[in-house]
């Protein structure tokens, strides 16, 4: 697979080719996933839950994320490396820049930040200094205590209207990509059509420009036993992990995943 860049992802959206993304935290899985055709490897703060055993993503630090970014970089075979900016790592503009630079120096190609229109100044700062940014909207796990739990966002018309406006504002601020988590499928489709940059979904229906899942979820691995509605176990019927990942890539590309049952209504 040729090296995936911001330009590559934009071209895929323009051609209508679906983008595949998986979380990844080490060199072996980075090699396996990128060889299987995954375009974007996300070093998510989900590592706090699936690797460290926490009940939320909040305890994860920038240093821990940078460590896993460096691990992924060593095994990667051409995929884009997207790194989460952890909880409170962007509390000020100075912190945003310093922590983002740390992750880029560790090997990331793009930084993901959680929030809404208030991220505009931070995104503009980073984009102007050569750091591509993915804006994570909808259900933002770092704000779980404010949101009252892991709930679908944007079901109320006022919320949906605000989310559409925020997406456009963040694109104008310089965001290179948007990730929508747990929003009604119809709203996700509207946002995808409203912006020129790629929109990746998780629990956001099939009309987005691509999909992302937590690696452990799509392999059927879970400590709690609770499986989110938007997850499919791609390990079922497959002889090995790389085959399962290839099945995920194929299903996203031919739009057989996500199916209607993996999404949410307004």
Swiss-Prot record:
This is 3-methyl-2-oxobutanoate hydroxymethyltransferase. InterPro entries: Pantoate_hydroxy_MeTrfase, Pyrv/PenolPyrv_kinase-like_dom, Pyrv_kinase-like_dom_sf. NCBIfam families: panB, PRK00311.1. It comes from Pseudomonas savastanoi pv. phaseolicola (strain 1448A / Race 6). Coiled coil: none annotated. GO terms for cellular component: cytoplasm. Homodecamer; pentamer of dimers. Pathway: Cofactor biosynthesis; (R)-pantothenate biosynthesis; (R)-pantoate from 3-methyl-2-oxobutanoate: step 1/2.
């Amino acid at each position: 697979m040729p090296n995936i860049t911001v330009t590559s992802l934009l071209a895929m959206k323009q051609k209508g080719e679906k983008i595949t993304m998986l979380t990844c935290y080490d060199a072996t899985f980075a090699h396996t996933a990128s060889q299987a055709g995954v375009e974007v490897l996300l070093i998510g703060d989900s590592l706090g839950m699936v690797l460290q055993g926490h009940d939320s993503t909040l305890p994860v630090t920038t240093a821990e994320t940078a460590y896993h970014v460096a691990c992924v970089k060593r095994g990667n075979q051409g995929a884009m490396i997207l790194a989460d900016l952890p909880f409170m790592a962007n509390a000020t503009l100075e912190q945003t820049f310093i922590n983002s630079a740390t992750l880029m120096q560790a090997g990331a190609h793009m930084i993901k930040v959680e929030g809404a229109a208030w991220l505009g100044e931070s995104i503009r700062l980073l984009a102007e200094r050569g750091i591509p940014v993915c804006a994570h909207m909808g259900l933002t796990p770092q704000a779980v205590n404010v949101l009252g739990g892991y709930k679908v966002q944007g079901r109320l018309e006022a919320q949906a209207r605000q989310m559409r406006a925020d997406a456009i504002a963040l694109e104008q601020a310089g965001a290179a990509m948007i990730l929508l988590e747990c929003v009604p499928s119809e709203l996700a489709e509207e946002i995808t059509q409203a912006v020129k940059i790629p929109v990746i979904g998780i629990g956001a229906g099939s009309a987005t420009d691509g999909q992302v899942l937590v690696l452990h979820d799509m392999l059927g691995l879970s400590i709690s036993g609770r499986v989110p509605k938007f997850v499919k176990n791609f390990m079922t019927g497959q002889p090995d992990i790389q085959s399962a990942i290839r099945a995920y890539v194929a299903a996203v590309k031919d739009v057989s995943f996500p199916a209607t049952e993996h999404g949410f209504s307004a």
